[in-house]
Amino acid sequence: MSLSLWQQCLARLQDELPATEFSMWIRPLQAELSDNTLALYAPNRFVLDWVRDKYLNNINGLLNDFCGTEVPLLRFEVGSKPAARAHNNPVTASVSAPVAPVTRSAPMRPSWDNSPAQPELSYRSNVNPKHTFDNFVEGKSNQLARAAARQVADNPGGAYNPLFLYGGTGLGKTHLLHAVGNGIMARKANAKVVYMHSERFVQDMVKALQNNAIEEFKRYYRSVDALLIDDIQFFANKERSQEEFFHTFNALLEGNQQIILTSDRYPKEINGVEDRLKSRFGWGLTVAIEPPELETRVAILMKKADENDIRLPGEVAFFIAKRLRSNVRELEGALNRVIANANFTGRAITIDFVREALRDLLALQEKLVTIDNIQKTVAEYYKIKVADLLSKRRSRSVARPRQMAMALAKELTNHSLPEIGDAFGGRDHTTVLHACRKIEQLREESHDIKEDFSNLIRTLSS
């Protein structure tokens, strides 16, 4: 056997794991193979414990695949492998350079906006060059959305048209819109890409009507290469705007021009929007963005800290991520607060320091999400009684909500499995563990369970 064994394992793990997980937990490991023992060296105890807890089965399975009957013993250590200590050069995940900002001519207002008529339309891109695919942290919660957005950026008008992204506030929908815009313009510098909030479309239409320039308005919006509209739910109950957008939508699709829309809810759940529009929203691909799971939350914090040239210990990132779960914006806001406090006081960023810097935020979070609150919310959602969740009844109409509530308690609180089991009628920790695994499996297999979980997370985190 040679060290290429670990290289083979790395190649398979890179294929099997999300890119952020692989870069954060697996790539930093150094390997040494001798005397039928494969030693894996982690940069610190936190990474070692995490890898051993989360990926040991994956690694052992690969060793069995590659080695057959001559499987080496696996050993974990903290530090660098002996040969590397003299020239310590830790391996880190390579990050592609961000897309270079596209040179654009100075934006000019369309003629309905009270400026003199122009011989050619000038497009307000509004795309933020800072939001790219390279600095979007990928995880299970947003993997499909990012992949779809990437395909649209590479092949606008041809792949997934329209693309409809939906999910709660602060989960990365707007970032992906800008990333698509930047991706399209990186490939074609003169592409006519327009990003806007849905309210801006309404405002532009009102101005066009006031200035007797509705034909100019139509020509502008129907001649773009890509139209990216955020928060489409704000079209609700605006009948004239919906009418105009309906015709704009049809014109763009007929011209193979790309449309990307975002909303805080599934298209058919948007109240106050015409059925014919909601139907069209689903013509292409509709993708949910879920609240980030723990590993992704940790990766987001580490990446944000790195962008600010701040050394954030892994155990501190884990501490914050375990307690703030609702969205990316909340995570980044908390980290900014920690960094500011550290800069003002000159103190090192430790768990105790974070407890102090975020004490009001952490106290509020713990107060808002309790097992009692979860039980009441789940019972109301499934139209059963809290007493049913605590009972011994095993019918599916009760057992499934009970499993859902247990899984949410594990996700949203800091209680141990035995504590959660005790709160559900004195059940043991193995019952809770089975419930969590069952819901995780069903979220992969059942759209309804996935929607239920997302809706309940959104309700409990808001």
UniProtKB/Swiss-Prot annotation:
GO BP term, example: DNA replication initiation
Region (Disordered): 104-125
Alphabetized UniProt keyword annotations: ATP-binding, Cytoplasm, DNA replication, DNA-binding, Lipid-binding, Nucleotide-binding
Binding positions (ATP): G170, G172, K173, T174
Region (Domain III, AAA+ region): 126-342
Domain IV, binds dsDNA: region residues: 343-462
Start and end residues of each stretch annotated as Domain II: 83-125
Domain comment quoted from the record: Domain I is involved in oligomerization and binding regulators, domain II is flexibile and of varying length in different bacteria, domain III forms the AAA+ region, while domain IV binds dsDNA.
Role according to the record: Plays an essential role in the initiation and regulation of chromosomal replication. ATP-DnaA binds to the origin of replication (oriC) to initiate formation of the DNA replication initiation complex once per cell cycle. Binds the DnaA box (a 9 base pair repeat at the origin) and separates the double-stranded (ds)DNA. Forms a right-handed helical filament on oriC DNA; dsDNA binds to the exterior of the filament while single-stranded (ss)DNA is stabiized in the filament's interior.
UniProt name for this protein: Chromosomal replication initiator protein DnaA
Name of the gene: dnaA
